[in-house]
């Protein structure tokens, strides 16, 4: 373990967690920084593949790897949008799905270190006499995955990407492995649709907590909806309809943009979305001043 790289890794992870926790997205974060053995192995492997790393050419850009694994497919793009506002994206490798080909969809992004991380990286370089530091870039790789596809990507990376020769000429096996990914992708879509359907059923039965929980799919605190809010929603079903029809990603980004630290619970969600989008006077009348000041 190279201490300087580990410090940068921890700093990046904490920054990502701070941003995503603002709106309560369901996710897990994994990270690693390459040690000397891993760096030398990669340099040797790429040289044998005919694509060597060079001081003034191709550099190793993933000495630090960060993977954000979301519970739901639609959160991948949401996370990407949020992180693009706090991290400089240098290069992106994002696959577009093909209709007639079983192929995994990658969302891999090369990101630049910020100024303090650049300084730490430079200090690590200066303090070492190892030649391999000449082919290390001051970047990290950010990977975005869903929880269903995460295991498949781990298998693919360890048993196909790192040993490509094993798969040469075995196209049916390769197609089958990709087909397994395709089934996981289909299940990702089905999972999101399942919760949307459940949210609609809760809307029809005026189960407002069920609607909010399954529509927005956030890490809500276990705080029930206040009776005042429930009564207003029961009396005016159009408010519930607007909540159900609301574009989830757009509304969550609006919440993210607010410079206000509030607990992630259903009461705050309803009052914030009403103040930002719906504008119902009855809900505005019971909205705390601290929220009104921020959203006016």
Per-range role (PLM):
Residues 2-4, 8, 19, 132-296:
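An acidic, glycine-/histidine-flanked metal-binding catalytic module
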Residues 6-50, 265:
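Surface-exposed, low-hydrophobicity interaction/linker segments
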Residues 62-71, 142:
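Short cationic amphipathic helices and targeting signals
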Residues 77-79, 118-120, 150-153:
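Short helix/loop capping segments that flank catalytic or ligand/cofactor-binding pockets
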Residues 53-61, 131:
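Short, flexible, solvent-exposed loop/turn segments with mixed acidic/basic and small polar residues
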Residues 90-132:
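Short Gly/Thr-rich strand-loop-strand
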Residues 84-91, 163:
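A common structural junction motif
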Residues 79-86, 123-127:
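Short amphipathic alpha-helices in soluble, non-transmembrane regions
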